[in-house]
Amino acid sequence: MKIGILALQGAFAEHAKVLDQLGVESVELRNLDDFQQDQSDLSGLILPGGESTTMGKLLRDQNMLLPIREAILSGLPVFGTCAGLILLAKEITSQKESHLGTMDMVVERNAYGRQLGSFYTEAECKGVGKIPMTFIRGPIISSVGEDVEILATVDNQIVAAQEKNMLVTSFHPELTDDAHLHQYFIEMCKEKRQ
């Protein structure tokens, strides 16, 4: 099994470290050639936290947006954390257009405020159990379509969800010592390959 990690900007190294600890091979995808070269071998894709506007621009500049979108729509499992969640959203409240736009949800960028407003909590996540959650200027999922399953909420806000092959979190599971969500994603990837 090999998981691709979008490595244009953001917390991609932290995701690679978690996958390594779980014994799963990962590959950093920095450009279209990387993606096309590894696409047939990929069991899944991680879109890390970072700055979503910058990542969206780089995806367009590297001509990666449409090929990644097509792969996701064709069933490639994807795990978007924080900025990765924003990349997957069909609608972003403060922007005219979405980026990949594959997941039926509306999100509000930086809803948890400035970096100083970042926080840590623990909450139940459906199918995973109680997990630590680190929020750094995280987005809020303000609404979801009928096919989207809400996995976790904090203070009545949706912070984790899944729609078919797409898993998203408003928080950064890669910044904790808990690998349960990554393991959940790996199981999604295994199911898809069967």
Swiss-Prot record:
- What are the entry keywords? Glutamine amidotransferase, Hydrolase, Lyase, Pyridoxal phosphate
User: Which Gene3D superfamilies does the record associate with it?
Assistant: 3.40.50.880
- Binding residues for L-glutamine: 50-52, 109, 136-137
The entry lists its GO molecular-function terms as: glutaminase activity; pyridoxal 5'-phosphate synthase (glutamine hydrolysing) activity
What Pfam families does the database record attribute to this sequence? SNO
What is one GO biological process annotated to this record?
pyridoxine metabolic process
InterPro entries according to UniProt:
Class_I_gatase-like, PdxT/SNO, PdxT/SNO_CS
Q: Known CDD domains for this protein?
A: GATase1_PB
What does the function comment of this entry state?
Answer: Catalyzes the hydrolysis of glutamine to glutamate and ammonia as part of the biosynthesis of pyridoxal 5'-phosphate. The resulting ammonia molecule is channeled to the active site of PdxS.
Per UniProt, subunit arrangement is:
In the presence of PdxS, forms a dodecamer of heterodimers. Only shows activity in the heterodimer.
Q: Please identify the protein, giving its name as recorded.
A: Pyridoxal 5'-phosphate synthase subunit PdxT
- Species, as recorded: Streptococcus pneumoniae (strain CGSP14)
